[in-house]
């Protein structure tokens, strides 16, 4: 798509629960900025977990061509998962940050510190192709997009934008969910520092051509982007997914 102002029929989805409630405080700000930059758009505000996926699917069915998700990495991933599952290449995803980490948006110069700049990037109408990953699991569902291969061998799948992690980063996310005194990037940094010294590691068994990957590791990440956890760098040469292992002895 050329770099002229966005002319796509646009639907904006706000997640007020993103960023531990910070998303609710940014709704009026974003609406004001969007009305100044977009010729017209419609919007909805979620009222329960994962409703953004349903709203995105309905918006596509109603003929909208640009689905804008206002939230953080979780909100963006939920909407992206549904859009990819629908398989309509003419529909684009827009990102406006109001979450805790907002890591995937950093790939495109989208900063949570400047809502006006984020809306400006959206309004320019430039579409950039990006990779997505997909996790499949036999048995337990992995979210809204579930593919059933056979009745005897169900396999569920879920697409992701930023990364899939096991171990240390999961412990950090669990701690952020229980914290009540911080928000945003600082929350991630404080809980990460705490777990850096207390987390013991997890035993992994991996199917890989690389020798010596089994054993205890601090974390395993399968990344599609260079940042996670509120701006922490992770080794991820694009355009391929990168598997990163870190042992407990490799703590910074």
What kind of region is each of these model predictions?
Residues 3-5, 9, 86-89, 238-240:
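Short, conserved loop/helix-junction motifs that constitute active-site signature segments
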Residues 17-19, 72-75, 98-101, 166-168, ...:
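Short glycine-rich anion-binding loops that position phosphate/pyrophosphate groups of nucleotides
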Residues 19-23, 130, 229:
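Short N-terminal binding/cap micro-motifs at the start of the first secondary-structure element
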Residues 24-26, 80-83, 106-108, 233-234:
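Short amphipathic alpha-helical segments
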Residues 27-30, 60, 84-85, 177-180, ...:
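Short, solvent-exposed amphipathic alpha-helical segments in soluble enzyme
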Residues 36-37, 46, 85-218:
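Catalytic core of DAGKc-family lipid kinases
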Residues 218-252:
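Internal helical hairpin/lid segments
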């Amino acid at each position: 798509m050329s770099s002229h102002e966005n002319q796509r029929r646009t639907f904006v989805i706000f997640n007020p629960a993103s960023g531990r409630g910070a998303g609710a405080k940014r709704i009026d700000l974003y609406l004001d900025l969007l009305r100044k930059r977009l010729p017209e758009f419609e919007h909805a505000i979620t009222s329960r977990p994962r409703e953004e996926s349903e709203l995105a699917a309905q918006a596509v069915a109603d003929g909208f061509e640009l689905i804008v998700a206002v939230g953080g990495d979780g909100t963006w991933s939920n909407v992206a998962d549904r859009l990819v599952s629908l398989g309509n290449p003419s529909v684009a995803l827009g990102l406006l940050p109001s979450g805790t980490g907002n890591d995937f948006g950093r790939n495109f110069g989208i900063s949570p510190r400047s809502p006006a700049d984020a809306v400006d990037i959206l309004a320019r109408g430039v579409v950039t192709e990006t990779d997505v990953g997909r996790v499949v699991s036999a048995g337990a569902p992995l979210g809204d997009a579930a593919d059933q291969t056979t009745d005897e061998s169900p396999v569920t799948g879920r697409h992701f934008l930023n990364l899939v992690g096991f171990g240390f980063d999961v412990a950090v996310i669990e701690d952020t969910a229980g914290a009540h005194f911080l928000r945003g990037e600082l929350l991630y940094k404080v809980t990460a520092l705490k777990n850096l010294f207390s987390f013991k590691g997890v035993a992994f068994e991996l199917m890989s051509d690389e020798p010596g990957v089994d054993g205890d590791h601090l974390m395993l990440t399968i990344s599609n982007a260079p940042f996670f956890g509120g701006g922490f760098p992770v080794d991820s040469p694009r355009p391929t997914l990168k598997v990163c292992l870190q042992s407990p002895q490799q703590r910074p």
